[in-house]
Protein backbone atom coordinates (compact mmCIF):
# COMPACT_ATOMS: atom_id res chain seq x y z
CA UNK A 1 0.00 0.00 0.00
CA UNK A 2 0.92 3.65 0.19
CA UNK A 3 2.50 3.32 3.65
CA UNK A 4 4.85 0.59 2.46
CA UNK A 5 5.76 2.58 -0.65
CA UNK A 6 6.50 5.64 1.51
CA UNK A 7 8.66 3.52 3.78
CA UNK A 8 10.40 2.04 0.72
CA UNK A 9 11.28 5.54 -0.49
CA UNK A 10 12.53 6.54 2.98
CA UNK A 11 14.58 3.34 3.29
CA UNK A 12 16.05 4.03 -0.16
CA UNK A 13 17.27 7.41 1.09
CA UNK A 14 18.81 5.79 4.18
CA UNK A 15 20.41 3.06 2.05
CA UNK A 16 21.74 5.60 -0.46
CA UNK A 17 23.34 7.65 2.33
CA UNK A 18 24.89 4.49 3.79
CA UNK A 19 26.31 3.26 0.48
CA UNK A 20 27.13 6.47 -1.38
CA UNK A 21 27.41 9.00 1.40
CA UNK A 22 25.59 12.27 1.39
CA UNK A 23 25.00 15.25 3.55
CA UNK A 24 24.80 14.70 7.29
CA UNK A 25 21.47 16.55 7.39
CA UNK A 26 19.88 14.28 4.76
CA UNK A 27 21.25 11.19 6.48
CA UNK A 28 19.90 12.20 9.89
CA UNK A 29 16.57 13.45 8.54
CA UNK A 30 15.90 10.29 6.52
CA UNK A 31 16.73 8.06 9.52
CA UNK A 32 14.55 10.08 11.91
CA UNK A 33 11.58 10.15 9.55
CA UNK A 34 12.01 6.43 8.79
CA UNK A 35 12.03 5.58 12.52
CA UNK A 36 8.92 7.71 13.09
CA UNK A 37 7.00 6.10 10.22
CA UNK A 38 8.04 2.60 11.37
CA UNK A 39 6.73 3.41 14.84
CA UNK A 40 3.40 4.50 13.34
CA UNK A 41 3.30 1.34 11.22
CA UNK A 42 3.65 -0.79 14.36
CA UNK A 43 0.65 1.06 15.88
CA UNK A 44 -1.33 0.30 12.71
CA UNK A 45 -0.31 -3.38 12.76
CA UNK A 46 -1.41 -3.74 16.40
CA UNK A 47 -4.78 -2.12 15.60
CA UNK A 48 -5.37 -4.44 12.62
CA UNK A 49 -4.46 -7.51 14.68
CA UNK A 50 -6.72 -6.39 17.52
CA UNK A 51 -9.65 -5.81 15.17
CA UNK A 52 -9.14 -9.31 13.75
CA UNK A 53 -10.91 -9.12 10.39
CA UNK A 54 -7.91 -8.57 8.13
CA UNK A 55 -4.44 -10.04 7.84
CA UNK A 56 -2.03 -7.52 9.36
CA UNK A 57 1.00 -6.57 7.28
CA UNK A 58 4.46 -7.49 8.44
CA UNK A 59 6.71 -4.91 10.04
CA UNK A 60 8.68 -3.14 7.31
CA UNK A 61 11.98 -4.54 8.63
CA UNK A 62 10.62 -7.97 7.63
CA UNK A 63 9.77 -6.64 4.17
CA UNK A 64 13.32 -5.33 3.80
CA UNK A 65 14.75 -8.79 4.53
CA UNK A 66 12.41 -10.62 2.13
CA UNK A 67 14.20 -9.63 -1.07
CA UNK A 68 17.67 -10.63 0.12
CA UNK A 69 19.07 -13.09 -2.39
CA UNK A 70 16.85 -11.66 -5.12
CA UNK A 71 17.62 -7.96 -5.52
CA UNK A 72 19.96 -5.47 -3.91
CA UNK A 73 18.32 -2.71 -1.89
CA UNK A 74 19.95 -0.23 -4.24
CA UNK A 75 17.55 -1.22 -7.05
CA UNK A 76 15.16 1.72 -7.14
CA UNK A 77 13.68 1.70 -10.65
CA UNK A 78 9.91 1.38 -10.67
CA UNK A 79 9.02 -0.11 -7.31
CA UNK A 80 12.53 -1.56 -7.18
CA UNK A 81 13.02 -4.31 -4.66
CA UNK A 82 9.68 -3.60 -2.92
CA UNK A 83 7.62 -5.41 -5.56
CA UNK A 84 9.76 -8.54 -5.21
CA UNK A 85 9.64 -8.39 -1.41
CA UNK A 86 5.85 -8.03 -1.42
CA UNK A 87 5.42 -11.01 -3.77
CA UNK A 88 7.65 -13.09 -1.48
CA UNK A 89 5.70 -11.98 1.59
CA UNK A 90 2.47 -13.12 -0.06
CA UNK A 91 3.95 -16.50 -0.95
CA UNK A 92 5.24 -16.99 2.60
CA UNK A 93 1.73 -16.48 4.04
CA UNK A 94 0.24 -18.96 1.56
CA UNK A 95 -0.91 -16.72 -1.30
CA UNK A 96 0.42 -18.42 -4.42
CA UNK A 97 -1.68 -16.59 -7.04
CA UNK A 98 -0.35 -13.08 -7.62
CA UNK A 99 -1.20 -10.45 -10.22
CA UNK A 100 1.50 -7.78 -10.55
CA UNK A 101 -0.04 -4.78 -12.29
CA UNK A 102 2.15 -2.18 -13.99
CA UNK A 103 0.20 1.02 -14.58
CA UNK A 104 0.87 3.60 -17.27
CA UNK A 105 3.47 1.55 -19.15
CA UNK A 106 6.05 1.68 -16.34
CA UNK A 107 8.93 -0.04 -18.14
CA UNK A 108 11.26 -0.27 -15.12
CA UNK A 109 8.51 -1.86 -13.04
CA UNK A 110 7.68 -4.22 -15.92
CA UNK A 111 11.31 -5.34 -16.17
CA UNK A 112 11.69 -5.94 -12.43
CA UNK A 113 8.33 -7.76 -12.13
CA UNK A 114 8.98 -10.01 -15.14
CA UNK A 115 12.58 -10.77 -14.19
CA UNK A 116 11.93 -11.46 -10.54
CA UNK A 117 8.72 -13.44 -11.11
CA UNK A 118 10.79 -16.00 -13.04
CA UNK A 119 13.31 -16.32 -10.19
CA UNK A 120 10.51 -16.54 -7.61
CA UNK A 121 8.76 -19.27 -9.65
CA UNK A 122 12.05 -21.19 -9.83
CA UNK A 123 12.34 -21.09 -6.03
CA UNK A 124 8.61 -21.56 -5.34
CA UNK A 125 7.16 -23.87 -8.03
CA UNK A 126 3.59 -23.39 -6.73
CA UNK A 127 3.78 -19.64 -7.32
CA UNK A 128 1.38 -18.53 -10.04
CA UNK A 129 2.44 -15.00 -10.97
CA UNK A 130 1.19 -12.97 -13.89
CA UNK A 131 2.31 -9.45 -14.81
CA UNK A 132 -0.21 -7.15 -16.46
CA UNK A 133 0.40 -3.80 -18.10
CA UNK A 134 -2.49 -1.38 -17.76
CA UNK A 135 -2.12 1.65 -19.95
CA UNK A 136 -4.01 3.19 -22.88
CA UNK A 137 -1.99 1.17 -25.40
CA UNK A 138 -2.69 -2.22 -23.82
CA UNK A 139 -5.17 -4.61 -25.37
CA UNK A 140 -8.08 -5.36 -23.03
CA UNK A 141 -8.48 -8.77 -24.68
CA UNK A 142 -4.83 -9.61 -23.95
CA UNK A 143 -5.22 -8.50 -20.32
CA UNK A 144 -8.37 -10.59 -19.86
CA UNK A 145 -6.79 -13.63 -21.52
CA UNK A 146 -3.73 -13.42 -19.28
CA UNK A 147 -5.98 -13.22 -16.21
CA UNK A 148 -8.08 -16.18 -17.43
CA UNK A 149 -4.93 -18.24 -18.00
CA UNK A 150 -3.67 -17.34 -14.53
CA UNK A 151 -7.02 -18.31 -12.96
CA UNK A 152 -7.08 -21.58 -14.91
CA UNK A 153 -3.69 -22.45 -13.37
CA UNK A 154 -4.68 -21.27 -9.87
CA UNK A 155 -4.75 -23.70 -6.97
Tell me what each language-model feature is.
Residues 1-155:
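An N-terminal assembly and electron-transfer interface module characteristic of large anaerobic redox
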Amino acid sequence: GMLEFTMYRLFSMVHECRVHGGSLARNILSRVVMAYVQKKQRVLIRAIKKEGTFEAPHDFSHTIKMCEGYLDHGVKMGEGWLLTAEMLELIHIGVNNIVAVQPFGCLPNHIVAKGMSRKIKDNFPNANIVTLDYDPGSSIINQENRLRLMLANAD
